[in-house]
Swiss-Prot record:
Cross-referenced InterPro entries: Formyl_transferase-like_C_sf, MPG, MPG_sf
GO molecular-function terms, A-Z: alkylbase DNA N-glycosylase activity; DNA binding
GO BP: base-excision repair
Protein's name in the database: Putative 3-methyladenine DNA glycosylase
First-tier enzyme category under EC: hydrolase
Keywords attached to this entry: DNA damage, DNA repair, Hydrolase
CDD domains, alphabetized: AAG
Lineage of source species: Bacteria, Bacillati, Bacillota, Clostridia, Peptostreptococcales
NCBIfam families xrefs: 3mg (TIGR00567)
Length: 202
């Protein structure tokens, strides 16, 4: 995706990346997943956002970068969460990637997540392999070493196509049935907890 693609406001970007491919490369490995769940955080006036009240700290600096930069933060002291800066520089809106669907390298994803082969997983484990922000970061080996880097780099990027095991280009769909709901686990955000800024496809 080109730079301008990520300069949308947070809500538009959260919708636009649904159905696109999140691709992770490391140690000569390539993992392809499809983005199926996102949340928008709309900057300094959003009580659910880390930058509410224009709180610019060392932690939130990536959100003030131009759209298309990676913001990884830790929750509960152990789980990484992947976000993308949206809009333009110094407009700190972002998108949290909440869920992805594994497309390729299922064993690699499974080893990262559960330390066993994909064929050894229970139905419950398969269902829950990447359906949460901390889960997908563990499955894709996403950590804070990627913080502030471009989502258009070599290590982690978003694309509207990938190459299958036969070398054929597979493109994302343009027509999607996007669902909306309240964002998850932000009960502290007063009226903002009721905003319908969570987006997902089934």
């Amino acid at each position: 995706m080109e730079k301008d693609f990520f300069r949308k406001n947070g809500i538009d970007l959260a919708k636009s990346i649904l159905g696109k491919y999140l691709i992770r490369k490391y140690e000569n490995k390539v993992i392809v997943t499809k983005i199926i769940e996102t949340e928008a955080y709309m900057g300094v006036n959003d009580k659910g956002a880390h930058v509410y009240g224009n709180k610019k700290t060392d932690r939130t600096k990536p959100l003030y970068l131009d759209g298309g930069h990676i913001y990884v933060y830790l929750i509960y002291g152990m789980y990484n969460c992947l976000n993308l800066s949206a809009n333009i520089e110094n407009v700190p809106e972002c998108v949290l990637i909440r869920g992805v669907e594994p497309i390729t390298s299922l064993d690699e994803i499974s080893m990262n997540r559960y330390n066993k082969a994909y064929t050894e997983l229970s139905k419950y484990q398969v269902k829950n392999i990447t359906n949460g922000p901390g889960k997908l970061c563990k499955a894709l080996k996403i950590d804070r070493s990627l913080n502030s880097k471009s989502i258009m780099g070599e290590e982690l990027y978003i694309s509207d196509f990938y190459y299958d095991d036969k070398g054929k280009k597979v493109f994302s769909k343009d027509e999607l049935d996007i669902k909306t709901s309240k964002r998850i686990n932000i009960d502290y955000a007063e009226e903002a907890k009721d905003f319908l800024w969570r987006f997902y496809i089934e």
